Amino acid sequence: MVIVIEPHGTYAIYEQIVNQIKNQIISGTLQPDEALPSIRGLAAEIGVSVITTKRAYEELEKEGLIRSVSNRGFYVCKYNGII
């Protein structure tokens, strides 16, 4: 999964993460049931805070695009074409 952050962009960093993951789900780059990086792992990979990544994952979960599985991590949900 590739996420590119523009630190001084128009959107907040967590929104950039949400939008990029959302686009990868819609385009099929990320498939249903595919595991996402851990919150800490993604934060370290893209150089943002854990809190920022957590907020992005929470937003994606609210939108029904990802789900959290206890003690296992986050997984992509089946995209039904509606957001």
PLM features: residue spans?
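Extreme N-terminal segment that seeds HTH/winged-HTH DNA-binding domains in transcriptional regulators
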Residues: 1-35, 41
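N-terminal helix-turn-helix
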Residues: 36-67
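HTH-adjacent hinge/linker in prokaryotic transcriptional regulators
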Residues: 63-83
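Poly-acidic low-complexity segments
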Residues: 6, 49, 78-80
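Aromatic side chains
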Residues: 14, 57, 74-75
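Generic alpha-helical secondary structure signal
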Residues: 15-18, 61, 79
